[in-house]
Swiss-Prot record:
Coiled coil: none
Database matches in Pfam families: Iron_traffic
Transcription keyword on record: no
Organism annotation: Alkalilimnicola ehrlichii (strain ATCC BAA-1101 / DSM 17681 / MLHE-1)
GO biological process: cellular response to oxidative stress
Protein name stated in the entry: Probable Fe(2+)-trafficking protein
Stored HAMAP family: Fe_traffic_YggX
Highest taxon of the lineage: Bacteria
Keywords, in A-Z order: Iron
Length: 88
């Protein structure tokens, strides 16, 4: 049976994630409140952030930045693209 969540990003009930996608309390919060569809949106947005800011995800500062952006994306005012970002 598919697990459903009230997705904070989409504002509606949708299919939930199969397991927490991130460690710790933030991962648990995402698991309980974010749908698969919204998680896929985040992955696309995160890829854009990594590319545009030329981040190296294994570096602690980059991980901290991405974690903050992830929390804003789902539970804050959102995460925006860099000022000069031009989608293709």
């Amino acid at each position: 049976m598919t697990r459903m969540v009230q997705c904070v990003r989409l504002g509606r009930e949708a299919e939930g994630l199969p397991r927490p996608p991130y460690p710790g309390e933030l991962g648990k919060r995402i698991y309980e409140n974010v749908s698969k569809e919204a998680w896929q949106e985040w992955l696309r947005h995160q890829t854009m952030l990594i590319n545009e800011y030329r981040l190296t995800p294994v570096e602690p500062r980059a991980r901290q930045f991405l974690e903050k952006e992830m929390e804003n994306f789902f539970f804050g005012d959102g995460s925006s693209a860099p000022p000069d970002y031009q989608p293709e």
